[in-house]
Amino acid sequence: MQIYMVGGAVRDRLLGRPVNDRDWVVVGATPDDLAARGFLPVGRDFPVFLHPETREEYALARTERKSGRGYRGFVVDTAPDVTLEQDLSRRDLTINAMAVRGEDPAAWELVDPYGGARDLQAKLLRHVTDAFREDPVRILRVARFAARFTDFSVAPETMALMREMVDAGEAADLVPERVWQEIARGLMEAAPSRMFEVLRGCGALAVLLPELDRLWGVPQRAEYHPEVDTGVHVMMVLDMAARLHAPLAVRFASLVHDLGKGTTPADVLPRHIGHEQRSATLLADVCERLRVPVECRETADVVAREHGNIHRSAELGAAALVRLLERCDALRKPARFADVLLACECDARGRLGFEETPYPQRQRLLGALQAARSVDTAAVAARAQARGAAGPQVGEWIRRARGDAVQEWMAAQPPAAGT
């Protein structure tokens, strides 16, 4: 029985990056061999075990053979005679198909049958063998790695193979949950726009997210958007979210906030009147199709519907600000509203020449929210009921009280913040 550290841990060590997770492959063993040594079986689709002390994953060396379309159509062989080279050959990229012999990190003996170290030096994302085409999830993984390794490029032959897979309908067969899983991971990388540029380049974006793909080539008014192209703008917004270390919900909202601009009638371009509601409608379809988690879905919906009003909030008086807070459900969900405002800041700064421009709307609305939440709604309701108010009338009393509190807060602000 031989044990090898494989995959991302080897790659990251060669790159001088921190190694957070280590994966291991065991050659020449059976499930019974590992169980006898105290390893705990956890794999459902193929034999994976947890080390009895480190709890790291150890998998039996395996081969895979395509048996159908999509992500799940595989026959797996984990016989003891499967070699390390055979196991590495099924991996997606050469930089992920390297191994180190043994469990002692000091005894560094690299096994690199497919030129992964060479491609690391050349900063290339290259597929290992033609078996790459057997798993369409690899299209998403390559795009995600492009977002992580920002100075790497996709090898031309790998991009060509990905296009062939898309043309053959493989991308359309992907399981929605897996598509979302990979997109979510890509959104959290250093340069998430690169993921979508790669997906667009191979044609997969038009299959997986056609609502997003159609934004490229759609013009916006140059006085507000010097970058003009809506697709370019959305990628700038997304990268601004990464620059500001935004959480996943904000990054997803940044990605999908302008979907409605892709359906603007050609005869009114470059104006996009009413695109906010169209964006929200398209977003609902995307979230249903990809089964996007509720937190991401709700944050993105508020951003899609209200980002224009939030941008213009400096023009609003106290009563209108309270109505905006209510539409955003900010009084009940202040933490989510903070995420909404961060996404709107990314939108405003994700424009050519506006990257360093302050966004005072964010602090102004957070201040207005704090003032509105300071109102003792129970006391206001009691006064209203004492004067004969009931039902919606009580709500109006509370709304007016919040407006008064916001007005008082605005009056106390310096002119730049309160007007």
From Swiss-Prot:
Pfam families: HD, PolyA_pol, PolyA_pol_RNAbd. InterPro entries: CCA_bact (IPR012006), HD/PDEase_dom (IPR003607), HD_domain (IPR006674), NT_sf (IPR043519), PolA_pol_head_dom (IPR002646), PolyA_RNA-bd (IPR032828), tRNA_CCA-adding_enzyme (IPR050124). Its EC number is 2.7.7.72, 3.1.3.-, 3.1.4.-. ATP binds at residues 8, 11, 91, 141, 144. Residues 230-331 form the HD domain. Its cofactor is Mg(2+); Ni(2+). Keywords: ATP-binding, Hydrolase, Magnesium, Metal-binding, Multifunctional enzyme, Nickel, Nucleotide-binding, Nucleotidyltransferase, RNA repair, RNA-binding, Transferase, tRNA processing. CDD domains: HDc (cd00077), NT_ClassII-CCAase (cd05398). GO terms for biological process: RNA repair; tRNA 3'-terminal CCA addition. SUPFAM superfamilies: Nucleotidyltransferase, Poly A polymerase C-terminal region-like. Magnesium is required for nucleotidyltransferase activity. Nickel for phosphatase activity. Mg(2+) binds at residues 21, 23. GO terms for molecular function: ATP binding; CCA tRNA nucleotidyltransferase activity; cyclic-nucleotide phosphodiesterase activity; magnesium ion binding; phosphatase activity; tRNA binding. The keyword NADP does not apply. It catalyses: a tRNA precursor + 2 CTP + ATP = a tRNA with a 3' CCA end + 3 diphosphate; a tRNA with a 3' CCA end + 2 CTP + ATP = a tRNA with a 3' CCACCA end + 3 diphosphate. It comes from the Bacteria. CTP binds at residues 8, 11, 91, 141, 144. A single active site specifically recognizes both ATP and CTP and is responsible for their addition. Catalyzes the addition and repair of the essential 3'-terminal CCA sequence in tRNAs without using a nucleic acid template. Adds these three nucleotides in the order of C, C, and A to the tRNA nucleotide-73, using CTP and ATP as substrates and producing inorganic pyrophosphate. tRNA 3'-terminal CCA addition is required both for tRNA processing and repair. Also involved in tRNA surveillance by mediating tandem CCA addition to generate a CCACCA at the 3' terminus of unstable tRNAs. While stable tRNAs receive only 3'-terminal CCA, unstable tRNAs are marked with CCACCA and rapidly degraded. Belongs to the tRNA nucleotidyltransferase/poly(A) polymerase family. Bacterial CCA-adding enzyme type 1 subfamily. Monomer. Can also form homodimers and oligomers. HAMAP family: CCA_bact_type1. Comprises two domains: an N-terminal domain containing the nucleotidyltransferase activity and a C-terminal HD domain associated with both phosphodiesterase and phosphatase activities. This is Multifunctional CCA protein. It comes from Paracidovorax citrulli (strain AAC00-1).
